[in-house]
Amino acid sequence: MINYLKSFFLYEIVRGLTLTLKYFFKPKVTINYPYEKSPVSPRFKGEHALRRYENGEERCIACKLCEAVCPAQAIVIESDERDDGSRRTTRYDIDMTKCIYCGLCQEACPVDAIVEGPNFEFASLTHTALIYDKERLLYNGDKWEQELTNKLHKDYQYR
């Protein structure tokens, strides 16, 4: 009998509407994404970048540790030996469609040449635009150098 009266007076609907009205006047939890951005952790792993030294020389010494440690095999490196006996890369490609953003390349690098930056907005309509060559990676490093330095400084205590 009680169940019949509850269904007759639409008890469930009234209960649902009171719950809706209760949350209607509370502050919103969601973020209006393109116009508002949530804070990003200093340990966030985003778009890759190659860094340079202060004198403008690239940091990568072509040890190929990042290529060896990459579980997705997204990194391809070719190198040449210079006149002074050191090696530098002639080709450094990362296929961002294969990358799983694990950060192992960054951890394996002995000179902090390859890092994952704060940028996560790099969507593209074509597959070829997501295959980053050395120039694109160096451009990202130059563009994000200050933020990358701050990020590495904050993360240094955990390394």
Swiss-Prot record:
Catalyzed reaction equations: a quinone + NADH + 5 H(+)(in) = a quinol + NAD(+) + 4 H(+)(out)
Compartments in which it is found: Cell inner membrane
Cofactor: [4Fe-4S] cluster
Binding-site residues for [4Fe-4S] cluster 1, renumbered to this chain: C60, C63, C66, C109
Annotated S-S bridges: none
PROSITE patterns hit by this protein: 4FE4S_FER_1, 4FE4S_FER_2
Entry note: cofactor: Binds 2 [4Fe-4S] clusters per subunit.
SUPFAM superfamilies: 4Fe-4S ferredoxins
Biological process terms in GO annotation: aerobic respiration
Any one cellular-component term (Gene Ontology): plasma membrane
Database matches in InterPro entries: 4Fe4S_Fe-S-bd, 4Fe4S_Fe_S_CS, NADH_quinone_OxRdtase_chainI
Residues noted as binding [4Fe-4S] cluster 2 in the record, renumbered to the chain: C70, C99, C102, C105
Domain of life: Bacteria
Alphabetical UniProt keywords: 4Fe-4S, Cell inner membrane, Cell membrane, Iron, Iron-sulfur, Membrane, Metal-binding, NAD, Quinone, Repeat, Translocase, Ubiquinone
Keyword flag Membrane: yes
Membrane topology field: Peripheral membrane protein
Gene3D superfamilies: 3.30.70.3270
All residue ranges annotated as the 4Fe-4S ferredoxin-type domain in the record: 51-80, 90-119
Assigned EC number: 7.1.1.-
UniProt GO molecular function: 4 iron, 4 sulfur cluster binding; iron ion binding; NADH:ubiquinone reductase (non-electrogenic) activity; quinone binding
Similarity comment text for this entry: Belongs to the complex I 23 kDa subunit family.
Biological function: NDH-1 shuttles electrons from NADH, via FMN and iron-sulfur (Fe-S) centers, to quinones in the respiratory chain. The immediate electron acceptor for the enzyme in this species is believed to be ubiquinone. Couples the redox reaction to proton translocation (for every two electrons transferred, four hydrogen ions are translocated across the cytoplasmic membrane), and thus conserves the redox energy in a proton gradient.
UniProt subunit comment: NDH-1 is composed of 14 different subunits. Subunits NuoA, H, J, K, L, M, N constitute the membrane sector of the complex.
Name by which UniProt lists this protein: NADH-quinone oxidoreductase subunit I
Organism taxonomic ancestry: Bacteria, Pseudomonadati, Pseudomonadota, Alphaproteobacteria, Rickettsiales
